[in-house]
Amino acid sequence: MEPKFWQERWARNQIGFHLPEVNPYLLRHWSHLSLADDAKVLVPLCGKSLDLMWLASHGLRVMGVELSEQAVETFFSEQSLTPHITRRGAFTVYQADLLEVWCGDFFALGAEDLADCTALYDRAALIALPPLMRAQYAEHLNTLLRPGCQGLLVTLDYDQTQKAGPPFAVTDDEVAVLFGLKWTLEVLEARDILGESWKFVQDGVTRLDERVYRLVMR
């Protein structure tokens, strides 16, 4: 899956993955993390998510990472924010108060970029990636983040033979393989959401489960 794929999705406004509201799982489960009041939160593949604003509104320092320049500029425009724009290595960084969005390739991040990140929020990053890239993504997080980091991870699970991704199916077993050696994993919530997902029903999917994990890096 090349960067061009996502850039074209944004250019065509094919962004069904975008939620027009703060994610309910974030509202329900962020309090399960034991974080400093001003913790820095990494939000990979953030798009123009309203979750960024919610996190910043709670005094957290937010570091979104997004490939699409259009997504980043749309986010700041829609939130009526005028960012300060700088270059940091391979990234263009848009900053407004507690909020930073790094525009560029997530895989170009180095350990120094994430040195003060003590929290992770992944609502739509892992499930946006095909299998090989999921392994690379997890390994990147496992390598760059530090012990004690805590996070929320949201996944979808369905029969991948019934529908092509994205979003891709990620099983509980795969989460354990990707993160189990480095993180303590706890399922906070699991729901059957097929009845709420007409597009999946239309495509012939017969099972659709959403899970929310609490992760603590060891």
Swiss-Prot record:
Catalytic activity: S-adenosyl-L-methionine + a thiopurine = S-adenosyl-L-homocysteine + a thiopurine S-methylether
Cellular component per GO, a single term: cytoplasm
InterPro entries, A to Z: SAM-dependent_MTases_sf (IPR029063), Thiopur_S-MeTfrase_Se/Te_detox (IPR022474), Thiopurine_S-MeTrfase (IPR025835), TPMT (IPR008854)
GO molecular function, one term: thiopurine S-methyltransferase activity
One Gene Ontology term from the biological process aspect of the record: response to metal ion
Methyltransferase keyword on record: yes
Domain of life: Bacteria
Residues where S-adenosyl-L-methionine binds: 10, 45, 66, 123
Keywords: Cytoplasm, Methyltransferase, S-adenosyl-L-methionine, Transferase
Subcellular locations according to the entry: Cytoplasm
EC number of this enzyme: 2.1.1.67
Principal subcellular localization: cytoplasm
HAMAP family: Thiopur_methtran
Family note: Belongs to the class I-like SAM-binding methyltransferase superfamily. TPMT family.
Annotated protein name in UniProt: Thiopurine S-methyltransferase
Organism whose genome encodes this protein: Pseudomonas fluorescens (strain SBW25)
Gene responsible for this protein: tpm
